[in-house]
Structure formats: C-alpha cells, structure tokens
UniProtKB/Swiss-Prot annotation:
Component of the 30S ribosomal translation pre-initiation complex which assembles on the 30S ribosome in the order IF-2 and IF-3, IF-1 and N-formylmethionyl-tRNA(fMet); mRNA recruitment can occur at any time during PIC assembly. InterPro entries: NA-bd_OB-fold (IPR012340), RNA-binding_domain_S1_IF1 (IPR006196), S1_domain (IPR003029), TIF_IF1 (IPR004368). It comes from Chlorobium chlorochromatii (strain CaD3). It is found in: Cytoplasm. Gene3D superfamilies: Nucleic acid-binding proteins. This is Translation initiation factor IF-1. GO terms for molecular function: ribosome binding; rRNA binding; translation initiation factor activity. The keyword Methyltransferase does not apply. Belongs to the IF-1 family. Pfam families: eIF-1a. The gene is infA.
Length: 72
C-alpha cells in the first residue's frame, strides 16, 4: 500500500504554544495545530508569531500539520 502524499501549504503563525507547537492560519483561512520538523529544531531556527511558514498536512487529518520551512 503506497503512502499518501502530504499537502504543502503556506500560512502565518498566529500563536506559539508549549512543546514547540504553533497555531497556524493557512492561506485558505483554515487554522491548524502544527509542530516543528526535526531539521528546523536541529538547526535552532526560531519561529515567532507573525512568521510566514510552509506547512505539511496529512490528507487523513487536516487539523494537524508539520512546519517544514520558515520564510525569511
């Protein structure tokens, strides 16, 4: 069984929550709960409210996601 492709979409950080989780408002108006990917955590990239980010969302659960990139 093949793994489903994840959806990549851009959004803006609305709120910083505990445990490196963030509330992200996506381009389409949806708000998702997203955690930071391992590479971003490994390189100590700071993510603050107001930052524009790229989020990966699973097609199975569109309420949760993973932050994969922070735009400069």
């Amino acid at each position: 069984m093949a793994k489903e492709e994840s959806i990549e979409i851009e959004g803006v950080i609305v709120d910083a929550l505990p445990n490196a989780q963030f509330k992200v408002k996506l381009e389409n108006g949806l708000e998702v709960l997203a955690h930071v990917s391992g590479k971003i955590r490994m390189h100590y990239i700071r993510i603050l409210p107001g930052d524009k980010v790229k989020v990966q969302i699973s097609p199975y659960d569109i309420t949760k996601g993973r932050i994969t990139y922070r735009y400069k």
